[in-house]
Amino acid sequence: MSKKKAFTSLLYLASIVFLPWWISLSFNKSLESWVTDWWNTRQSEIFWNDIQEKNIIKNFIELEEILLLEEMIKEDSETHLQNLRIGIHKETLQLIKIHNEDHIHTILHFSTNIICFVILSGYSILGNEELVILNSWAQEFIYNLSDTIKAFWILLLTDFFIGFHSTRGWELMIGFVYKDFGFAHNDQILSSLVCIFPVILDTLFKFWVFRYLNCVSPSLVVIYHSMNE
């Protein structure tokens, strides 16, 4: 019976690791055509409301400069001007297409991640027994470690996530999550998140050391502070 529970728990752990990837891949493919049709049939007019975006403005300014150039060369042949108008029209359609594809990409990835979160939450609730078994294994493993080893791992993880050299790692991690949700790259937002998250984690960790470790294992706190110094 215990072997069966152990196998079920390990299978549950493996499914938690691979399930998000499978859900994302499946829903991306199944929702892509629906989101594209919905956007193209009902939301195409939003383009003209969102045209204030900087990258779209920049491209249309370039087109305006071409139009000014057209005015300057009116004495040129009518055929040349007609070709110029056709080129501007094609470029405008291309800008609209790129803009719409960006919006579809954002909606698709955001929807997929929300669905993935809901499914994983329900899966975690249904697999509560397996989570309890995995938690007991983890606690037993950690309990059997010496205080020195525990302090070493705590120091390593804190330096890795909230240490002086962790900024670049946070930039990559937050940038990956930000991109995975389909949002366009924004240096100001990413910089703000990189500044906020390590501070919050550092505060929570110090509070945990003060409230929990001091009560459970004072010797571990002493070793940790000695190694940290």
Curated annotation (Swiss-Prot):
GO biological process: one example: potassium ion transport
Protein keywords: Antiport, Chloroplast, Hydrogen ion transport, Ion transport, Membrane, Plastid, Plastid inner membrane, Potassium, Potassium transport, Transmembrane, Transmembrane helix, Transport
Top-level taxon of the source organism: Eukaryota
InterPro entries in UniProt: CemA (IPR004282)
Cellular localization per UniProt: Plastid, Chloroplast inner membrane
Segments traversing the membrane: 7-27, 114-134, 145-165, 189-209
UniProt family annotation: Belongs to the CemA family.
Protein name: Potassium/proton antiporter CemA
Species the sequence originates in: Daucus carota (Wild carrot)
Gene behind this protein: cemA
